[in-house]
A protein has these predicted regions:
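Catalytic cores of soluble metabolic enzymes centered on carboxylation/carboxyl-transfer
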Residues: 2-122, 212
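Structured functional modules or segments
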Residues: 183-231
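Short aromatic-glycine-enriched beta-strand elements
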Residues: 133, 153-154, 214-217
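Conserved beta-strand residues within beta-sheet cores
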Residues: 24, 104-106, 144, 162, ...
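Conserved nucleotide-binding/hydrolysis modules and their immediate coupling elements
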Residues: 108-133, 137-144, 151-152
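Short strand-coil-strand connectors
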Residues: 99-103, 117-119, 139-141, 157-161, ...
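Catalytic P-loop NTP-binding/switch module of NTPases
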Residues: 142, 148-193
Length: 231
């Protein structure tokens, strides 16, 4: 029953709202839950630092790398069919470097086989660019994976965790080492408002000492008043 529930959660799509689908899936997979050794302190005991995704095995990450490489190849094949392109009709790259879970895998895609790091991946998969869910048949077992496109690959969600896969053609991947990493700006000294509005009150002045939780300003947003506090 737990396995069927996990499979159902993998297929459930909910976007735009916060949800606990991954957390419920992780609990269903937890050995302690499956053995029935539960107490009212289960969540606090097993997730004392909060939940950031279910643990993922190396085998599953390797499988996801293969899926991501296949998806990237399908996307490239779709792109080459756009009308009005200049030059020769090129085949999509067959070799891809897929970085996922902190490791890089070499994925070789062909009509006859799918290789990950030189090893055959026994998988059956159908995908049309734009699909938000794929169901892969792996050694006779189904694995449902939710998809969302990123600038350099895909976000893959399954078995209670989301993974970002960066997919680059093998002849392009070495150049990624020369890309300058973009460091996010330090916004710790700024007061951020969730949406545009009209400032109706400011409770502090230049040079004032402020503490966490202290009200700093009031903003009017669509006829609602929002108090901004120091986080």
């Amino acid at each position: 029953a737990a396995d069927k529930q996990i499979a159902a959660l993998d297929r459930f799509e909910l976007e735009g709202l916060g949800h606990n689908i991954d957390f419920v899936s992780a609990i269903m997979q937890h050995p302690r839950f499956r053995s029935g050794e539960l107490t009212t302190g289960f969540i606090a005991e097993e997730y004392p630092d909060g939940f950031s995704g279910a643990a993922t095995s190396d085998d599953l990450l390797r499988t996801l790398a293969g899926i991501a490489g296949f998806l990237a190849c399908a996307q490239a094949d779709r792109a080459r069919q756009v009308d009005g392109q200049l030059g020769d009709d090129l085949d999509p790259p067959a070799e891809w470097h897929v970085r996922i879970g902190g490791a890089t895998h070499l994925v070789d895609v062909s009509e006859e086989d799918l290789l990950v790091d030189g090893e055959h991946l026994n998988i059956g998969l159908e995908y049309t660019p734009g699909d938000r869910l794929v169901v892969a048949d792996i050694d006779g077992k189904e694995l449902a994976v939710k998809l969302s496109k990123t600038r350099t690959g895909f976000k893959l969600t399954t078995r209670g965790a989301s993974h970002t896969a960066i997919c680059l053609p093998a002849h392009v991947a070495p150049l990624a080492a020369y890309m300058i990493e973009k460091v996010p700006p330090d916004l710790s000294r700024f007061l951020l408002c969730p949406m545009p509005g009209l400032v109706t009150a400011i409770h502090v002045g230049a040079g004032d000492k402020v503490e966490a939780g202290q009200p700093l300003a009031v903003v009017e947003l669509l006829f609602a008043r929002l108090g901004l506090r120091l986080g």
